Amino acid sequence: MDFSSKIRLIKDFPKPGINFRDITTLLQDAKAFKQAVDAMVGLCKDFDVDVIACPEARGFVLGAPMAYAMGKGLVLLRKPGKLPGKAVSHSYQLEYGMDSLEVHEGAILPGHKVLLVDDVLATGGTVAAGVELIKKTGGEVVGIAFLIELLGLNARDKLGNYPVVTLLQLDA
């Protein structure tokens, strides 16, 4: 299947000069969504994984069915204040300010092998923060998977030597 034909391009969103890749059009197509998840699971089949972690919010949409298909647990990396229990937090720099990701204490145990899943690799800031958060818990990132990688933004430079797999590579 040509997954790129299922991704809508929205120019100048969320601000002028940005070409936003909207995955909701792929998600609305049941066949395309299933095949995309199956293909991502296939890309990750050689990773030795205990749990899948995914950042809010679109990471949840891909991470949950992948965890189910792979028979693994799912760990949600949330924005601040969204978790009801005690959380571990990691703050990171955005273009215009700071943000944070949090995970429940004990959701990722020391030594857990973690596959990090998100929808789009653009600047790499969110996923790099996810890597640092997982490391804070004692977990080990064994791979990172994306539906889409936007080329030309050098995001992989922020991810070090972690194995990265992507279903689609599109121009930014």
Swiss-Prot record:
Pfam families hit by this protein: Pribosyltran
Protein name (Swiss-Prot/TrEMBL): Adenine phosphoribosyltransferase
Oligomeric and partner information: Homodimer.
A GO biological-process term: adenine salvage
HAMAP family: Aden_phosphoribosyltr
Keyword Transferase appears in the UniProt entry: yes
InterPro entries (UniProt xref): Ade_phspho_trans (IPR005764), Adenine_PRTase (IPR050120), PRibTrfase_dom (IPR000836), PRTase-like (IPR029057)
Main subcellular localisation: cytoplasm
Top-level taxon in the UniProt lineage: Bacteria
Function: Catalyzes a salvage reaction resulting in the formation of AMP, that is energically less costly than de novo synthesis.
UniProt keywords, alphabetically: Cytoplasm, Glycosyltransferase, Purine salvage, Transferase
EC code: 2.4.2.7
Source species: Desulforamulus reducens (strain ATCC BAA-1160 / DSM 100696 / MI-1)
